């Protein structure tokens, strides 16, 4: 996102969008475009993000099973929602797109967010918004805080159909995704302990291992 955002800035565009190439459904990109357009047409703030929520995530293996949630997404969303619940005092499942590779945002928002690398990119975007605009930690972006940050999660009609990649790939995704929550200043010590246990239980981390810190790219505009 950081490199793509820089190219968009140089071309003076208002939006930047991302898609993943592992969806086997014909016409998937056309649906993404309509979802992004719908989200931005609803936005009242110039600082807006649209994240695709999959209707189903079936895998291609020996047989077809239409699973509602991806395994990594289910775990990531659990801890994203735990952070929100902890800060608000209300249990919630509102955050459903913690690992949404298909997403778009206005350049006004894109240029003030820090980014992580690899599979930590999408969770870090949300964590960056929580930290900078959650109303608890101080922010250096007063104009954006005044306008408000809008995040739209829009569900597809088509499923996200892709091949089964195995447990090793899931572990490779889970570790960086949860690490951004683990090291966030926004999370509580209790959530930090839960994440550590989760990664050990999922086989993504050995009991004696330290969770690696994600590499964070600073905002393109301070």
For the regions a protein language model found, what residue spans apply to each?
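Active-site nucleotide-sugar/metal-binding loop of Leloir-type enzymes
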Residues: 2-15
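Short, high-confidence coil segments that cap the C-terminus of an alpha-helix
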Residues: 12-14, 44-50, 149
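Short beta-strand-to-loop acidic/aromatic patch adjacent to the donor-nucleotide binding site
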Residues: 13-24
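Conserved donor-nucleotide/metal-binding helix-loop-beta segment in metal-dependent transferases, i.e.
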Residues: 25-56
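Well-ordered, non-membrane alpha-helical segments in soluble/globular domains
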Residues: 30-40, 69-83, 123-124, 168-183
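Short, flexible, basic/aromatic active-site loop/helix in glycosyltransferases
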Residues: 44, 48-58, 62, 69-95
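Aromatic-glycine-rich donor-binding/catalytic loop that engages nucleotide-sugar donors
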Residues: 62-63, 85-120, 131-138
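C-terminal catalytic/acceptor-binding lobe
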Residues: 119-222
């Amino acid at each position: 996102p950081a490199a793509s955002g820089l190219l968009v800035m140089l071309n003076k565009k208002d939006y930047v969008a991302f898609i993943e190439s592992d969806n086997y459904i014909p016409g998937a990109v056309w649906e993404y475009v309509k979802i992004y357009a719908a989200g931005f047409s609803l936005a009242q703030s110039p600082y807006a993000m649209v994240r695709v929520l999959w209707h189903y995530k079936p895998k291609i293996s020996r047989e077809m099973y239409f699973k509602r949630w991806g395994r990594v997404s289910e775990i990531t969303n659990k801890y994203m929602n735990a952070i929100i619940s902890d800060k608000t005092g209300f249990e919630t499942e509102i955050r459903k797109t913690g690992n949404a590779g298909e997403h778009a945002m206005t350049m006004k928002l894109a240029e003030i967010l820090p980014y992580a690398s690899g599979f930590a990119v999408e969770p870090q975007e949300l964590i960056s918004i929580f930290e900078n605009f959650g109303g608890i930690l101080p922010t250096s972006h007063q104009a954006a805080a005044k306008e408000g940050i809008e995040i739209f999660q829009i569900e597809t009609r088509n499923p996200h159909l892709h091949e089964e990649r195995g447990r090793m790939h899931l572990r490779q995704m889970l570790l960086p995704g949860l690490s951004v929550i683990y090291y966030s200043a926004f999370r509580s010590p209790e959530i930090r302990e839960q994440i550590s246990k989760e990664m050990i239980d999922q086989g993504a981390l050995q009991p004696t291992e330290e969770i690696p810190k994600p590499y964070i790219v600073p905002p393109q505009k301070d």
